Amino acid sequence: MTEAHNACCHPSGTAAGHHGAGKASTDMMDAVDRRLLDIIQTGFPIEPRPYAVLGETLGITECEALARVRALRERKVIRRLGANFDSWKLGFRSTLCAAKVPEDRIDAFVAEVNRHVNVTHNYLRNHEYNIWFTCICPSWEQVCSLLDGITERTGIPILNLPATKLYKIRVDFRMD
């Protein structure tokens, strides 16, 4: 890699500040950002230099493609950049979970739930069942063991709601 490439694509220091508490900022997006988002939602290049491929597709440099993705992440427009797998076809099992958590115990309960890498989503809702999360494990036995362990450590029962039929697994947010 050239010195210019390193300076552009691997700047020293840290990102500049946070823009709000988790709120995405889309007001500074141009047409290239929108095209970039359309492409990477479903067709992120599986290549040794994916940002070079993105840059070529968009008519920009590799460094600019990487810089744009970084900026979109910093502004929380991109929340996650990674692969999605069909966990069921890989033999994994997942479930939707709900719990009635007293308000004064929410932080402790959420901390216990979130410490498990098997938990993929966790939401606070305005409902009798106020904490909802999903978990995925290599087997049903491990799903049940994980949920039993959380209940044991927190004293809060968890409603286990495995899917009986899958209707939709993904969505693309078209930007054009």
Swiss-Prot record:
Domain of life: Bacteria
Catalytic activity: siroheme + 2 H(+) = 12,18-didecarboxysiroheme + 2 CO2
GO molecular function per UniProt: lyase activity
Keywords linked to the UniProt accession: Heme biosynthesis, Lyase
EC identifiers of the protein: 4.1.1.111
Free-text function comment from the UniProt entry: Involved in siroheme-dependent heme b biosynthesis. Catalyzes the decarboxylation of siroheme into didecarboxysiroheme.
Miscellaneous note of the record: Binds heme b, but reducing agents do not affect the activity of the enzyme.
Protein known as: Siroheme decarboxylase alpha subunit
